[in-house]
C-alpha cells in the first residue's frame, strides 16, 4: 500500500529496556515530502504514570491513536480500579490497528509502547497492520536503520537506566547526523516504578549530545 511509505519519510524514535525501567527517545522534526514542516514536534506521549508511547508516521493519525490509548487507559482504571498494563494496552491498540487495516482505512503510524506489566518493565513495537512484537530495544522511522546500528552494538541485557539513556541518545544522535528526515534535537523520557513517567530536562539531554 503506497500510503504506508509515509512511515519511512522522517522521524527517529527509540525504545530501550533497562534493569529498572524503560527509556524512550525521539527527534523533533516533522517533514512533509522534502520540506521541514515542524521543528518542535512532540513524538513521545504520556498515557498514564507508567506507560508512554512514541509515534512515527502521520501526525493526525498518531494524535487519534494517542487520544484513544488515553481514553482506554482511563476507562480500564475506572472499571478495574487499577492501571492498565503496557501489555494489555499494546494488545488493545493492536486490535484497533488491525481492524482499521482490514477496513481499508489504516492508521499510518508505527508505535513503541513502553511501560510496566505489574513490576516488570516491558517494551512493544506495533506497526500499522497491528503486528506486535515485544522487544529489548527497538527503533522506528526513516532514521531507524542508523539507530539500530548503535542499539545492536551497545545494548546489553539488564543494563542500568543511566546507561540506557546514554545509548538511546547516541542512537537518535546518529540518525540526526545521517538522516535528513531526522533533526531539531532529542527528547528523552524514562519510566520507572519510583518516578513514573519523567521527561529529562533539556540541559541534561544537551550534555549527553555534546
Swiss-Prot record:
EC numbers: 3.4.25.1
Localization, UniProt: Cytoplasm
GO cellular component labels: cytoplasm; proteasome core complex, beta-subunit complex
Main localization category: cytoplasm
EC main group: hydrolase
Catalytic activity line of the entry: Cleavage of peptide bonds with very broad specificity
Keyword terms: Autocatalytic cleavage, Cytoplasm, Hydrolase, Protease, Proteasome, Threonine protease, Zymogen
One matching Pfam family: Proteasome
Gene Ontology BP terms: proteasomal protein catabolic process
Active site, UniProt feature: 11 (nucleophile)
Pro-piece positions: 1-10
PROSITE patterns in the record: PROTEASOME_BETA_1, PROTEASOME_BETA_2
Keyword Hydrolase carried by entry: yes
Keyword set includes Hydrolase: yes
Family to which the UniProt record says this protein belongs: Belongs to the peptidase T1B family.
HAMAP family with a match to the protein in the record: Proteasome_B_A
PANTHER family membership: ATP-DEPENDENT PROTEASE SUBUNIT HSLV, METALLOPROTEASE TLDD
Assembly description: The 20S proteasome core is composed of 14 alpha and 14 beta subunits that assemble into four stacked heptameric rings, resulting in a barrel-shaped structure. The two inner rings, each composed of seven catalytic beta subunits, are sandwiched by two outer rings, each composed of seven alpha subunits. The catalytic chamber with the active sites is on the inside of the barrel. Has a gated structure, the ends of the cylinder being occluded by the N-termini of the alpha-subunits. Is capped at one or both ends by the proteasome regulatory ATPase, PAN.
Protein name: Proteasome subunit beta
Amino acid at each position: 500500500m503506497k500510503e504506508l511509505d509515509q512511515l519511512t519519510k522522517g522521524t527517529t524514535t527509540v525504545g530501550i529496556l533497562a534493569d529498572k525501567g524503560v527509556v524512550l527517545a525521539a527527534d523533533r522534526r516533522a517533514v512533509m515530502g522534502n520540506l521541514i514542516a515542524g521543528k518542535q514536534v512532540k513524538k513521545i506521549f504520556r498515557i498514564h504514570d507508567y506507560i508512554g508511547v512514541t509515534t512515527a508516521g502521520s501526525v493526525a493519525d498518531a494524535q487519534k491513536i494517542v487520544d484513544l490509548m488515553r481514553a482506554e487507559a482511563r476507562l480500564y482504571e475506572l472499571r478495574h480500579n487499577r492501571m492498565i498494563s503496557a501489555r494489555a494496552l499494546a494488545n488493545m491498540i493492536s486490535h484497533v490497528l488491525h481492524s482499521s487495516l482490514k477496513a481499508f482505512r489504516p492508521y499510518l503510524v508505527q508505535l513503541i509502547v513502553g511501560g510496566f506489566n505489574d513490576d516488570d518493565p516491558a517494551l512493544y513495537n506495533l506497526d500499522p497492520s497491528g503486528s506486535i512484537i515485544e522487544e529489548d530495544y527497538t527503533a522506528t522511522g526513516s532514521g531507524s536503520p542508523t539507530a539500530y546500528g548503535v542499539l545492536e552494538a551497545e545494548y546489553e541485557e539488564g543494563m542500568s537506566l543511566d546507561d540506557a539513556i546514554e545509548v538511546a541518545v547516541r542512537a537518535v544522535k546518529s540518525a540526526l547526523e545521517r538522516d535528513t528526515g531526522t533533526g531539531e534535537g532529542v527528547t528523552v523520557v524514562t519510566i520507572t516504578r519510583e518516578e513514573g513517567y519523567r521527561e529529562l530536562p533539556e540541559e541534561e539531554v544537551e550534555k549527553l549530545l555534546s
